A protein has these predicted regions:
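Flexible, solvent-exposed loop/hinge segments and secondary-structure transition points
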Residues: 2-190
């Protein structure tokens, strides 16, 4: 018995079969890559923090992070202490970089939740630098940054990123010339 490919049932069964096969493949790929994705997100965060304290491979006007395979080693070398602030408590935690600032911001809407605010203390060239994550709204979507300041509250480095800003002016926050404009500015200037 030959299949009648002219009927609607054939088309429907073919479409359902294709969806099941492709969906299964995508689910298998997603679950097999979960660990790699998680590790890459951690490395990216470490690279961002390192960039904010001036540990990068800059060439010209580009923003070049330290290589991913060196990020963890360099992070552990320069970041001497990790803490987070929760309510009125300061808690030392060597995994503070795992705190998701976006999720903490969303949880802050619940008055019973005390959100965790991470702070990274680095030592570079004999001086302490304090790196804090910042998150806010851009024109179209979220903007976030890591800003490093010294004991005098002078900005020593910053790294900006965004999810979906306009290709023109908004996307310039990822350009080195934009980030370099903040270096040397005081947080305490009025």
């Amino acid at each position: 018995m030959a299949l009648n490919t002219e009927k609607n049932t054939y088309t429907l069964l073919f479409a359902v079969g294709l969806v099941v096969i492709v969906g299964t493949l995508l689910a298998a790929i997603d679950s097999s890559l979960k660990d790699k994705i998680r590790i890459n997100k951690i490395l990216e965060k470490q690279q961002n923090i390192l960039y904010a304290i001036g540990i990068n491979e800059n060439e010209g006007n580009s923003v070049n992070f330290i290589a991913a395979d060196k990020a963890e080693k360099e992070f552990n070398k320069y970041i001497t202490k990790q803490i987070y602030i929760q309510g009125d408590q300061v808690i030392e935690d060597d995994k503070a970089y795992l705190i998701d600032v976006k999720k903490q911001k969303a949880l802050a809407k619940d008055p019973s939740h005390k959100r965790k605010l991470p702070l990274f203390i680095a030592e570079k060239d004999g001086r302490n630098l304090y790196v804090a994550p910042i998150r806010g709204k851009g024109l179209w979507d979220a903007i976030w940054a890591y800003v490093s300041v010294d004991e005098d509250m002078i900005i020593r480095g910053i790294y900006f990123d965004h999810k979906a800003e306009t290709p023109g002016l908004g996307a310039n926050i990822k350009q080195r010339f934009f980030m370099d404009d903040f270096i040397g500015e005081s947080l305490l200037d009025s």
